[in-house]
Regions:
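Conserved, mostly hydrophobic/aromatic
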Residues: 3, 37, 41, 72, ...
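An alpha-helical appendage that flanks or caps ligand/catalytic pockets
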Residues: 5-9, 35, 39, 126, ...
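Active-site mouth loops of central-metabolism enzymes
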Residues: 13-28, 84-93, 129, 174-185, ...
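Hydrophobic faces of well-ordered beta-strands that scaffold small-molecule active sites
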Residues: 3-5, 45-47, 80-85, 110-114, ...
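Acidic (Asp/Glu)-rich catalytic clusters
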Residues: 38-39, 70-78, 99, 103-110, ...
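Alpha-helix-loop-beta-strand connector modules within alpha/beta enzyme cores
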Residues: 56-82, 139-143, 223, 330-348
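Catalytic domains of carbohydrate-active enzymes, especially glycoside hydrolases
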Residues: 28-48, 192-203, 309-315
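N-terminal beta1-alpha1-beta2 module of alpha/beta enzyme domains
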Residues: 1-75, 175-178, 347
Length: 349
């Protein structure tokens, strides 16, 4: 199992909690976390792309993903960087060029997470294209064809439904094409992703929910691309404490739902515009991306046992949220990594 974490572009992760132990939506904090994670041996960070804050409410600060990703690449040595991109907000030719440059800056540690969007209000405010659910996956497919074509060919041409690229040149090309991650749960989403992505990422679930999903997307990719996905990642919110009682107390603290909180409206819009294959609970609203559904809550030994079930289900990358992140990255590295055979350089005081 490899371990990654979400870069805190919103400051914190919790919708029901205001201040999160010094987590702030600033480059200073992101730099602190990035350097720490790199030193501790974390494998990858997912940098979400949202121009509005869907955790703390749209009036709260949030940082821009692409400028952050370039900066993270410059201050780390080993940490892989997975930057989210929504095709409705970008030209694929420009993203191909930008990605090639960040790949060079990072010595080929850069990858993309293609997100087919869900937030109509954000698209309205920032001028993004917000097509219907199935249309967004068609657009994403064309978008990735252009990325891969420009990274590969001397001149790339495509006349598509969404894009017209007339013999475009990209130089210098990346030494290694950035890996394309993507996630989706609907029938159309899984089919499209199996055709264009290299790796699959999903929101949190139970082992019984995840295992058939992983088997399904691998089978689709074998049919459409001739092989399994190179990685399968899952979002998870992790709470590790010295005793189970302490962990459950923290869980109770962060899941006391306030329907009047600023982030509640964006949660309801996410439900409306995403064809999910499970029903979300208000508890899952508390942290987003169904991060609590895997139930990685307890002592390090209990969480390690649970992670073993996800390994058996086919997950090989956990994308962790936890709060406050700077403390929890070190706690997880020191207490959990050794139980799973993951090299850790953490030393808790």
């Amino acid at each position: 199992m490899r371990f990654g974490y979400w870069t805190p572009v919103y400051g914190g992760f919790l919708r029901n909690t205001g201040e999160e132990g010094g987590m702030e939506a600033t480059w200073d904090y992101v730099k602190r976390v990035s350097v720490l994670a790199d030193q501790l041996g974390w494998d990858i960070t997912l940098v979400p792309e949202l121009y509005l804050n869907d955790r703390k409410g749209i009036d709260a600060p949030s940082l821009e993903a692409w400028s952050l990703s370039t900066a993270i690449a410059a201050v780390t040595d080993e940490l892989r960087i997975m930057t989210a991109v929504r095709p409705g907000f970008h030209l694929p030719t420009v993203i191909a060029k930008t990605s090639a440059t960040i790949a060079d800056i990072s010595s080929d540690r850069f990858s993309l997470n293609v997100v087919s969007a869900w937030w109509a209000e954000e698209a309205k405010q920032y001028g993004g294209v917000f097509a219907s659910h199935d249309e967004r996956y068609i657009q994403s497919s064309e978008f990735v064809r252009i990325l891969k074509g420009m990274w590969r060919d001397d001149r790339f041409t495509l006349q598509g439904r969404f894009y017209d690229v007339p013999a475009a040149v990209l130089s210098p090309k990346p030494r290694v094409a950035p890996r394309i991650f993507a996630g989706g749960e609907s029938e159309s989403g899984r089919e499209a992703i199996a055709a264009f992505a290299d790796a699959y990422v999903m929101h949190g679930g139970t082992p019984d929910e995840v295992a058939p999903k992983v088997a399904d997307v691998h089978a689709r990719r074998r049919r459409l691309q001739g092989g399994d996905f190179e990685e399968v990642g899952m979002a998870a919110y992790v709470i590790i404490r010295d005793t189970e009682k302490e962990a459950l107390a923290e869980l109770d603290r962060i899941t006391t739902v306030d329907p009047g909180s600023p982030g509640y409206a964006s949660f309801e819009e996410f439900e409306r515009h995403s064809n999910l294959d499970v029903e979300l609970t208000k508890r899952e609203y508390s942290v987003g991306t169904r991060g609590l559904r895997p139930n990685l809550v307890g002592t390090a030994e209990q969480v390690a046992e649970r992670i073993g079930e996800f390994q058996n289900a086919g997950v090989d990358l956990l994308l962790v949220q936890s709060s406050p992140l700077h403390d929890e990255l070190e706690r997880i590295s020191a207490q959990l990594f050794p139980l799973l055979g993951v090299e850790s350089r953490a030393v808790l005081a």
